[in-house]
Amino acid sequence: MTAGIAPMKRELKELQLLFEISQILDRTLDLREAVGPVIDAMAAHMGTVRGTLALINRQTGEISIDAAHGLSESQKERGRYRVGEGVTGKVIQTGRPMVVPRVSEDPLFLNRTGARDGLKKKDVAFICVPIKIGTEVMGALSADHVLPKEVSLEEDVRLLTIIGSMIAQAVRLRQSAQEERQKLMDENRRLQDQLKEKFRPANIIGKIGRAHV
C-alpha cells in the first residue's frame, strides 16, 4: 500500500506543476513575462536549486541565458556558449536531452556562470532538454538538483521535456523579437559608422577643396 503512495504523490505534483504552467501561458505568451514564473514554479514543485532558459540567436549562432532561477544577473551574463559547446551547446546542436549525474565528473560541463562554485559539485546533477518545434531547436531548458533526490533523473528529463514543449511557442516569439532587435541594432551601428566616416574632418576638407577647383 505504502509503495504505491509515492508515485501517486509524484504524479499529483507533476499535474499541479503542469496546470500552473498552463495558467501562466494562458495569461501571456510574452516570454519575458512567462518564463520567470515558469522557472520559479519548477523550483517550487521539482525542488530544483537552479533553472535556466537559454536561447540561440540564429543570426550570430550565440547561445545566451534569457531567464534563470537561482542565478545573479552577472552569472546570467556569463552564461554564453556556441553551438556544440558545453552541455547546453551540445543539447541545442543534437536536439536531444542530456543528463549529467554529477557535474564534477563530466568535462563537458563548463560551469561558465560560476553558479556552482559554492557547492560540492559531486553533489549536483544537471539536466538539460531542447526546446523545439518540429525539428527546429530554439533553445534549451535546464535544471540543477542537489543529490541525493527522491525522484529519478529520468523522470525529471521526461517532465522537463513536457515543459519545454509547452513553452516552445512563447520561445519562438521571443527568439524572433530578439533577433529583430539585434538586426536593428546592427543596422543602426552601420549607419552611425557611415555618418562618422562621411563627416570626418579630412573627408569634409577634401570635399571643400574639390568644390573650389
Residue ranges of predicted features:
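Signal-transmission linkers at sensory-effector interfaces
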Residues: M1-E33, A44, D66, D186, ...
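Regulatory loop-to-helix N-cap segments in sensory/regulatory domains
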Residues: T2-R10, D144-T161
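Amphipathic alpha-helical "output/dimerization" segments
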Residues: L17, I133, V151-Q169
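AAA+ ATPase active-site-proximal loops
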Residues: V35, Q192-H212
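GAF sensory/regulatory domain recognition
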Residues: D40-A43, T52-G79, E105
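Acidic/proline- and glycine-rich, intrinsically disordered low-complexity segments
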Residues: E73-M98
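Signal-transducing coupling segments at domain and membrane junctions
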Residues: E73-S74, P101-A125
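A short, aliphatic-rich beta-strand micro-motif
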Residues: V124-I133
